[in-house]
């Protein structure tokens, strides 16, 4: 017994010495230990974010979420609540345009210009059964093709299978009404779930050049590989892009990029059937006759004030008449472009839809001269000047993700936040930003983060140069039957709502290209010149 006690005490002494040594070692190397923990958790976070920025099972983190991450989380949670899961066992249980019923409330033989026309929509499935929930992606439009007139309608979802569709009768004549079921609520739910599951619908290929050697390598926002990666990071804004590092090639040798769609889908076979051409954009009001709208001897409409920077927008924001855009809340004057732009420095930042503006300016102002910036490719930065009038207009693309089958240079690419940061700004400086189309194939957190970072950069710009005019151009609607999982207008509509929400607290103006292109009925990511010209006319009224 005595020997056992001695052995027990000896064991305790040894354990105490061992514990003391471990504590001493950790204390001496605490910085290294915590750095290692931080690094592993950071890599774990980035490498496991392919399903969602904020997974169902939260990761254990030693660092609290940043303000940006908290805001992203908040926005995604709100969207998740608005787009609940809608599983279905058969297509017959999804919304049917044919079986749904639309009824004009308080119908009349003739309506008066300026009246509100309301339609009650009750949606049913393909078996004719009344649906008990909403969430369908609908598009309402009124038009008079002979008058080259059009406007969007407002859709109110009561979340019980009924909707109120409201039209403002802006003009006289015979008016056609349209209500399209773009996607049933089950399709909306499937698109939302699929979007946030993967970053690999688009494959990026980077070209690395070192002397006479040229190598191509896989790149992307997230790469699920154990290979060594080149990391192109903006640590401040927490944005990144990655390429598999080529052998015997430095990461700085990346010069060009192109992309293509990958044969991958996160939709089930049953879900895919909802996005076949015959099931997308189906007319609900096909049997409706045109309605007649008259002046009705109403008093002359009061003159509206001229459109100016900072005005708020309504829904709908205006209408097309004789192919010309007419806002609801103000009137657009005819502006002489050359004189309006005299002494102005115009920055056009974004995708190819804002590059259309650049091309329009160059085609419309014969005194603008293009400056060779010694770049190559379709997406090269553009600069045009009129030295006599001191006009300077430039377009630059934004940083990843930038989708394009044609090879483009990345040597001059930068995040828009950095371009805004180095802009001095003053009363004759105008910045127009367009984000959206290239983000549609990726999880929504990528777009939200970019929008928040741009918001912060604009906020800083307006603090140091409050006279700078910043205009946000929203997305155009695009082709309806083109690869819904990647490019559906549903994705664009969510981004449109996010933009309006994020930028509402800043002194910026929004050009509602979404509503404008619905009114024109273009269904083209690159609308025709007359539509682009009307978008630009809003800009000219804002800045002159």
Curated annotation (Swiss-Prot):
SUPFAM superfamilies: E set domains (SSF81296). InterPro entries: Ig-like_fold, Ig_E-set, NXPE4_C, NXPH/NXPE. It holds the Pfam family Neurexophilin. Glycans are attached at residues 29, 38, 47-48, 92, 160, 210. The keyword Membrane does not apply. Keywords: Glycoprotein, Secreted, Signal. One of its GO terms (cellular component) is extracellular exosome. It is found in: Secreted. Its main location: secreted. Residues 1-27 form the signal peptide. Gene3D superfamilies: Immunoglobulins. Belongs to the NXPE family. This is NXPE family member 4. It comes from Homo sapiens (Human).
